[in-house]
Amino acid sequence: LQQVPPTAVLNGIAFFMTLFVMWPTFSAIYEKSFKPMSEGTITLEEAYTQAEAPLRIFMYEQLGNDGGKYIKNFMAMANMAQPETPKDVPTYILIPSYILHELTVAFKIGVILYIPFIIIDMVVASILMSMGMMMLPPVQISMPFKLILFVLVDGWGLLTQQLFVSVLH
């Protein structure tokens, strides 16, 4: 049960959730950059600049209040002056700051998901030990309880809802 659901299914879910969340940004890029460039009204360099703006806005919105510390850290590592406005932050500083912020959020979600399952493991292990069943692996008994809990609380619904809330706040 280590790969349930399979990796391909998880990748598909991640892909379509990304499309859902990023659709407004992709639409803005299409309207401001790709469409004018394909019509020949702007050059490739202008199209790049126009496409970069919606992505920068999206990343800044995701960083929120606590994301500024990542920008400050990367600016300090690059020996650059601290930015006064968001436009002062180079894209090569903004991207890793955004990635670190998202990894931090993902780790927090993972820990929150893990806590109920580890509690179930500890309770089952305690019960098995008190019954003198030391040779029976607790995971073998606790797995059905974990699956039942996940289904009863609508785990996939809660997980996707919290992911969207963390992105769309």
Predicted regions mapped to residue ranges:
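Hydrophobic alpha-helical segments and their helix-loop boundaries in membrane
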Residues: L1-H169
